[in-house]
From Swiss-Prot:
Residues 1-61 are annotated as: Disordered. Pfam families: Histone. Core component of nucleosome. Nucleosomes wrap and compact DNA into chromatin, limiting DNA accessibility to the cellular machineries which require DNA as a template. Histones thereby play a central role in transcription regulation, DNA repair, DNA replication and chromosomal stability. DNA accessibility is regulated via a complex set of post-translational modifications of histones, also called histone code, and nucleosome remodeling. Keywords: Acetylation, Chromosome, DNA-binding, Isopeptide bond, Nucleosome core, Nucleus, Ubl conjugation. The keyword DNA-binding applies. Can be acetylated to form H2BK6ac and H2BK33ac. The modification N6-acetyllysine is found at K7, K37. The keyword Acetylation applies. This is Histone H2B.3.
Length: 153
């Protein structure tokens, strides 16, 4: 169903402009109005204001990722191999997922033991619970080594 044409209040126009205006209205009556140009999501027109002071640019939201650290580890292990952006995104998601699981498990352990603080002991136990077998043993030994190095330096 086509939208009804908008009715405008009658206003007196000069005699010479009436025929041109009527012709334009008749021509547009059967056609759909042109769609306005849309801006990408999150961007507004410069003149619209949108709660910000005119002339100021919107501050970029900082997004923290593990990409630089993944790349550094890759170069330590395989200096001659690169990584695609899609693979980097997958690795970043993987690390975020593991971090979330470990943090959740550590929080549960602290709650069970009625402790207000998550210590290295809770982290170590959660690593043993979340990661399987040999991987957990290696992760615990590497973590212990890293904490020892951090506290001695």
């Amino acid at each position: 169903m086509a939208p009804k044409a908008e009715k405008k209040p009658a206003a007196k126009k000069p005699a010479e402009e009436e025929p041109a205006a009527e012709k334009a209205e008749k021509a547009l009556a059967g056609k759909k109005p042109k769609a306005e140009k849309r801006l990408p999501a999150g961007k507004a027109e410069k003149g619209s204001g949108e709660g910000r002071k005119a002339g100021r640019k919107k501050a970029k939201k900082s997004v923290e990722t593990y990409k630089i650290y993944i790349f550094k580890v890759l170069k330590q292990v395989h200096p001659d191999i690169g990584i695609s952006s899609k693979a980097m995104s997958i690795m970043n998601s993987f690390i975020n997922d593991i971090f979330e699981k470990l943090a959740g498990e550590s929080a549960k352990l602290a709650r069970y033991n009625k402790k207000p603080t998550i210590t290295s002991r809770e982290i170590q136990t959660s690593v043993r619970l979340v990661l399987p077998g040999e991987l957990a043993k290696h992760a615990v030994s590497e973590g212990t080594k890293a904490v020892t190095k951090f506290t001695s330096a």
